[in-house]
Amino acid sequence: MSRQALVTIDLSDINSPRQLHAALAAALGFPSFYGMNWDAFWDAVTGLVDMPQQLELRGWPAFAARLPDEAAILQHILARMAQEMPDLAAQVHYA
């Protein structure tokens, strides 16, 4: 499977962790059995799907203000993947 060049996820209407996981799953092509939690997110991005070359998280500042804990966890997981699996990780743009 080849990696997409760019995936953009609009976070401006995300107001709950469930909405966030649904948006991530839809945009990144997670399987239907995705568990909608951070452990499942890690499993999905590191072994179930090919991450895009670039991932743009649009509306990040307002999203991070609304859901700071979720934003911190997402940012941490994406940074961890970039450190541990640089060839598979997306270059993330927090826009």
Features from the language model and the residues they span:
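Positively charged, polar, low-complexity stretches
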Residues: 1-95
